[in-house]
């Protein structure tokens, strides 16, 4: 069917779930902190360390990628990949530098869970 002259066909763009999550991690500071806080809360469970590293990798992807992170932290890109990869074993100092460079320091992430927990008990 031809469109009347001057009218444009409407197209609907839908994002995948992953794209939507990346957009929220990029644009919404509170969401990014909550996302990492949930992963941190589950770190002692089976697979929890890997889940936390996945959450960090997703935030890195959303906020400019590993090359950008390397520039902002002064850490070598290959070392970042190795540390934060599945099964990686990053030093605490690496995690702290990475989170700080991403704009969500560890203290924000850790204290957020404490704030959420106290709100639940207050209700």
Please tell me what each predicted stretch does.
Residues 2-55, 115-122:
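N-terminal flexible/basic segments that precede or flank functional cores
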């Amino acid at each position: 069917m031809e469109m009347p002259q001057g009218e444009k066909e409407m197209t609907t763009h839908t994002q995948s779930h992953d794209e939507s999550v990346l957009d929220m991690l990029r644009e919404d500071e509170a969401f990014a902190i909550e996302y990492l806080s949930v992963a941190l809360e589950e770190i002692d469970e089976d697979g929890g360390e890997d889940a936390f590293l996945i959450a960090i990798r997703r935030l890195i992807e959303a906020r400019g990628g590993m090359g950008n992170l390397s520039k902002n932290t002064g850490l070598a890109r290959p070392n970042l990949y190795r540390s934060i990869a599945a099964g990686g074993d990053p030093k605490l100092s690496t995690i702290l530098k990475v989170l700080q460079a991403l704009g969500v320091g560890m203290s924000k992430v850790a204290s957020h869970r404490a704030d959420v927990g106290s709100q639940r008990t207050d209700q």
